[in-house]
């Protein structure tokens, strides 16, 4: 096992702790559920659910979380295939226990619409 493994595990534990705070706040503030991933770098990524939401619902979920997190670097780009990609970065904590992450959403056009 690499010497850097203890660091990676600590970073993941820090992200796990922050995720626990996020889930508690989501219950309290009625924020929508996201699919969360903790990377080996300790980055925490929340993806808006595309299977159980409408395009408007996905955008609303993205905006709810980015607003609550005071996220920055928010981007809203439409790809050639008509998919809108939303992305924003956030930070939680300070110093050695700071956790960085992102909120993402890929909003596909409704099936009855052709991409332009």
Regions from the language model: what does each represent?
Residues 1-116:
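Structured alpha/beta or helical-core interaction and ligand-binding surfaces enriched in interleaved
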């Amino acid at each position: 096992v690499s010497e850097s493994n203890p660091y990676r595990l600590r970073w993941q534990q820090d992200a796990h702790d922050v995720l626990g705070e996020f889930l508690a706040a989501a219950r309290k503030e009625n924020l929508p559920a996201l699919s969360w991933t903790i990377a080996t770098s300790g980055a925490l990524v929340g993806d808006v659910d595309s299977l159980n939401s409408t395009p408007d619902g996905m955008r609303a979920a993205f905006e709810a979380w980015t607003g609550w997190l005071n996220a920055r670097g928010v981007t809203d780009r439409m790809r050639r295939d008509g998919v809108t990609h939303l992305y924003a970065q956030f930070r939680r904590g300070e110093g050695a226990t700071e956790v960085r992450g992102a909120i993402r959403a890929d909003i596909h056009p409704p099936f009855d619409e052709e991409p332009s």
